[in-house]
């Protein structure tokens, strides 16, 4: 996020395969020194992930300047579209030739974790979930 922050009016997630009656909670976390999510900055609420497609929430927020992490918690085993992480070390690869994607962990509930926590961290096979914000 640029110096001075950035005003946004939408936050969303791209769902590939939904699960009936499921939802995703969309949030923003500050990073820990190791790059994993830390303190909760925003909890924007939930969107339905019962069907595929781009799901968004209309919001009014100003993101703080610097590195921040868009995060989500899903209520079921939905399939999210993602960015392939091969050759993009910033998204969790151990090297430019690595094949690990973004970090995740079983939250055990739909609550907004604050802080995110570092126990039980796993890494997706090869992709980073496609979460997005829109400038106001």
Language-model features, listed with the residues they occupy:
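Aromatic- and Gly/Pro-enriched, solvent-exposed loop/edge beta-strand patches characteristic
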Residues: 20-99
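Short, surface-exposed beta-strand/loop patches at domain edges
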Residues: 73-136
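Short amphipathic alpha-helical surface micro-motifs
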Residues: 7-10, 52-54, 111-116
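Short, proline-centered helix/strand-breaking motifs
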Residues: 1-5
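A short beta-strand element within beta-rich, extracytoplasmic domains
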Residues: 6-17, 70
């Amino acid at each position: 996020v640029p110096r001075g922050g950035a005003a946004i009016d939408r936050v969303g997630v791209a769902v590939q395969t939904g699960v009936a009656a499921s939802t995703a909670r969309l949030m923003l976390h500050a990073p820990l020194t190791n790059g994993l999510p830390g303190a909760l900055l925003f909890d924007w609420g939930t969107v339905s992930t019962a069907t595929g497609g781009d799901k968004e929430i209309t919001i009014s927020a100003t993101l703080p300047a610097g590195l921040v992490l868009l995060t989500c918690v899903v209520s079921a085993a939905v399939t999210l579209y993602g960015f392939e992480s091969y050759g993009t070390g910033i998204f969790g690869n151990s090297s430019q030739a690595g094949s690990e994607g973004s970090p995740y962990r079983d939250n055990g509930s739909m609550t907004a974790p604050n802080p995110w926590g570092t126990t039980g961290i796993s890494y997706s096979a090869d992709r980073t979930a496609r979460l997005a914000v829109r400038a106001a």
